[in-house]
Swiss-Prot record:
Pfam family, one: Chitin_synth_2
Protein origin, superkingdom: Eukaryota
Single Gene Ontology BP annotation: chitin biosynthetic process
Principal location: membrane
Upregulation: Exhibits higher expression levels in hyphae than in germinating conidia. Expression is increased in the absence of chitin synthase CHS2.
EC number: 2.4.1.16
Gene3D superfamilies hit by this protein: Spore Coat Polysaccharide Biosynthesis Protein SpsA, Chain A (3.90.550.10)
GO CC entries: cell septum; plasma membrane
Catalytic activity: [(1->4)-N-acetyl-beta-D-glucosaminyl](n) + UDP-N-acetyl-alpha-D-glucosamine = [(1->4)-N-acetyl-beta-D-glucosaminyl](n+1) + UDP + H(+)
Membrane-protein topology: Multi-pass membrane protein
Residues listed as glycosylation sites in the UniProt record: N724, N759
Record protein name field: Chitin synthase 6
Localisation: Cell membrane
Native source species: Gibberella zeae (strain ATCC MYA-4620 / CBS 123657 / FGSC 9075 / NRRL 31084 / PH-1) (Wheat head blight fungus)
């Protein structure tokens, strides 16, 4: 027995020594990295309040970290020979302090999460009691940038969108290819979507109807994901410009091309943002729940699955309860279009070109989603306008290899810590979201303490310590509270593998330790050692984005020279415009640490004016002449939501995008018959009946359509079909009058603003009322 006990102590001491060294290194590196970011923010600050907060936050952070260091030592189950060296009074006080400090820091967020789970429905269940149709459902445009995606993955993503339990006529997918080449991916995709054109080259933008939903397929010059989203937004803005003047029920959803939407994802998003009882229409942005899926299961994919669920349903739900989420991921984010439109020029600016060093590169490029969320948080006028929708789900493919996972998590870590410090030093966030920022700060102080729990488990396994000798309450709070939530989440979502949360509780600290140490050392090597000889740099011929892409292709996204980005950008702008070599944006010698003050409160929804138009408060001075001019230049209040309403007013505006060509205009009669036959087959396969009579309309050859004015020889807009049909206008008026008198979905009792008026498809209304009369 004595030999076994001695052997257990030897094994325990040897393992514990290594783990303790790891914990100390992690403790020091996190402190050093946080202070380094504070110093960089202090050096780059554009306002004195940033410097003051740097000092206050830095001092408080160091003090709390220093206090937790002796707590870590006395809490560890050290051998008795060592534990006897500590004064009993000091040990008792520190353990008492540790218990209550961690209890508060863990229990308070847990209670916020419980409150959010109770007050908001969790799960993939339909929340709408009424059936949405093309009148009551708000319009949703989905932006899906695509670059070198697997064809079957892309088609699966598109199908998940158009097959959502949402009126197809209210779905408009913008599938944007990041590149103008007509490669196999593009040709295969348009073929799958029913494009039967056999030409040497296709229009840069094509409109098709796929499973009763509208899909706009576009090819843009290669510029990266954010640039692709930018030019797509310009196209959307051009399409719906006039529609937005008379409606504020247009929403834009950003998703990745490998994301699979849940069946009720769109409906639940819209319910929370617009249609829930008592909704005032002030919700501006929401993110959903992104879960991982995989074809090949492993311990890595299992940990990712549990981490995704815990990180979103716990951490983001807590943030949502405190006032706002701090990260709107580009993989699943819905925004109110009229509000986002005011932020677009700040949202889509090329942040990489403003980088001066690796700190800026990590903040604006690696942590782009967090930086942009910071932008929205300042732009919002009040709390709880940027939230988490716990009933909108989508799936994305989990990372399969350890190498790819480490690179991904290094990117996340560097983007997180740089943006976290920027948020903690922005007094506007402390003023608007005090509880949120305080919770974020306190959680940062207790990071990197998870390895201690492994030591406690090891002590029990090696019988060096008894359970009575360990801080059981300490373990019960940290593990027990989280495990209870994961048990509930697993049962609610029927995702029972997340019940293995204790496995993640033990293993994840080691993975997180490696992610952080690897990220800090590689970033530090780049910062103090200088760039490698093959590092990508920007110059007069290479943009910052191209340099970043070159580094990613080489397998190391940190192998760049961000010090060259801003200088190269200024040189190119000076060469392109000799008369104005500087701007207000470039006149500053230091990079921007926080969003500019002029966006404060700018992220807001439009309000209805006396003239029936929608405008922001600072746009309310529209004169009667302007309103009348707008009426004469558009199709009127009852605009057909399926048309490109803004084309007539935007023909002479060069936005650098191509107006979509309606595919029917490019077909001969035989191809058109094949296309409509394919549409009927798609319709049957997707389970959608032809109640609206869409396919019973007579076939119209290209010659049957009137000639359309186009911005260029290659760009033909969709036509204003039926715009002069007075009978249709009368039918629309009857629809709106009847629907507005009832207080159902689509009306708002507080200000009398009716939603979605006249939004039903013109073709569907004509088919219902005069089935024998063609459009």
């Amino acid at each position: 027995m004595h030999k076994n006990s001695l052997l257990g102590q030897i094994i325990y001491t040897s393992i514990m020594s290594a783990v303790l060294l790891m914990a100390c290194l992690e403790w020091f590196l996190w402190l050093a990295a946080f202070l380094y970011c504070l110093v960089k923010v202090f050096q780059k600050s554009e306002h004195w309040s940033i410097n003051v907060l740097c000092i206050i936050v830095g001092t408080a952070f160091v003090l709390l970290r220093v206090i937790f260091l002796p707590i870590m030592v006395v809490t560890l189950p050290l051998p008795d020979a060592i534990a006897k060296l500590w004064p009993e009074e000091m040990v008792s006080f520190l353990q008492w302090f540790a218990f209550w400090a961690f209890a508060i820091l863990l229990t308070v967020p847990w209670l916020f999460c419980i409150y959010q789970v109770v007050t908001n429905q969790l799960g993939r269940t339909k929340r709408m009691k009424q059936v949405l149709d093309d009148v009551t459902a708000p319009k949703v445009v989905i932006v899906m940038p695509c670059y070198r995606e697997e064809p079957e993955v892309l088609i699966k993503a598109i199908n998940s969108v158009v097959d959502c339990d949402y009126p197809p006529s209210c779905i408009h997918v913008f599938l944007s290819f990041d590149g103008e080449e007509e490669d196999n991916l593009y040709l295969n995709t348009i073929s799958q979507l029913g494009v039967l054109l056999k030409t040497e080259s296709h229009p840069r933008s094509i409109d098709v109807k796929y499973r009763s939903a509208r899909v706009t397929i576009s090819r843009f010059p290669h510029g990266g994901k954010r640039h692709c989203q930018k030019v797509t937004f310009k196209l959307i803005d051009r399409v719906y410009e006039e529609y937005l003047k008379r409606n504020d029920n247009l929403f834009i959803l950003f998703i990745d091309s490998d994301c699979i939407l849940d069946k009720v994802c769109l409906q639940n998003f819209v319910y929370d943002m617009e249609l829930s009882p008592g909704n005032t229409g002030e919700m501006l942005a929401m993110t959903g729940v992104i879960t991982s899926t995989t074809k090949k299961h492993s311990i890595i994919t299992l940990l990712q699955d549990m981490e995704y669920i815990h990180g979103q349903l716990f951490e983001r739900t807590v943030e949502s309860g405190c006032g706002s989420v701090t990260c709107l991921p580009g993989a699943l984010t819905m925004l109110r279009f009229s509000a986002f439109r005011r932020m677009a020029k700040y949202y889509f600016v090329d942040k990489a070109e403003q980088c001066e060093d690796l700190f800026d590169f990590a903040k604006c490029h690696l942590g782009e989603d967090r930086w942009l969320t910071h932008l929205f948080m300042i732009g919002a006028k009040k709390r709880h306008q940027i939230q988490m929708c716990t009933s909108a789900f989508c799936k994305t493919e989990a990372v399969q290899s350890t190498r790819s996972l480490v690179k991904q998590r290094r990117r996340w870590f560097l983007g997180f810590i740089t943006n976290e410090v920027c948020m903690l030093t922005d007094w506007r966030l402390w003023k608007r979201y005090p509880i949120l920022i305080l919770v974020r700060f306190m959680q940062n102080t207790i990071r990197t303490t998870a390895l201690l729990f492994f030591v406690m488990v090891l002590a029990i396994m090696t019988t060096v310590k008894k359970v009575d000798d360990l801080p059981v309450g300490f373990i019960a709070i940290s593990l027990g509270l989280n495990w209870m939530l994961m048990l509930y989440f697993g049962a609610k979502l029927r995702r029972f593998k997340i019940w293995l949360y204790p496995l993640m509780f033990i293993l994840n600290p080691f993975y997180n330790w490696y992610y952080m140490v690897y990220g800090i050392f590689t970033a530090g090597q780049r910062t103090w050692g200088g760039p490698r000889a093959d590092a990508a740099a920007a110059d007069s011929h290479t943009t910052a984005r191209e340099a970043a892409e070159q580094a990613e292709k080489q397998g190391d996204e940190l192998n760049v020279v961000p010090e060259t980005f801003k200088a190269a950008h200024e040189a190119r702008r000076a060469a392109s415009n000799r008369e104005s070599t500087t701007t207000s944006e470039l006149g500053r010698t230091k990079s921007v640490i926080r969003p500019p003050g002029k966006i404060d409160g700018k992220f807001s929804a439009r309000q209805k004016t006396a003239s029936g138009m929608y405008a922001h408060p600072d746009e309310m001075d529209i004169s009667a002449n302007d309103v009348e001019k707008g009426r004469r230049g558009t199709r009127g209040f009852f605009a057909d939501r399926d048309s490109l309403d803004s084309i007539s007013s935007a023909q002479n505006i060069d936005l650098g995008v191509s107006t979509p060509r309606r595919m029917k205009l490019l077909m001969n009669e035989e191809d058109l018959r094949k296309y409509q036959l394919g549409q009927q087959i798609q319709n049957r396969n997707s389970g959608i009946d032809d109640a609206e009579g869409i396919y019973r309309q007579p076939i119209r050859t290209p010659s049957a359509f009137p000639h359309a004015h186009s911005a260029s020889a290659n760009d033909i807009p969709l036509h204003d079909l039926g715009a002069n049909d007075t009978a249709a206008q009368g039918s629309r008026s009857e629809d709106i009058q009847r629907f507005s008198e009832g207080r159902g979905i689509g009306t708002r009792a507080d200000n009398g603003r009716s939603r979605n008026v006249g939004n039903s498809s013109f073709a569907s209304r004509m088919a219902k009322r005069t089935p024998k009369t063609s459009r």
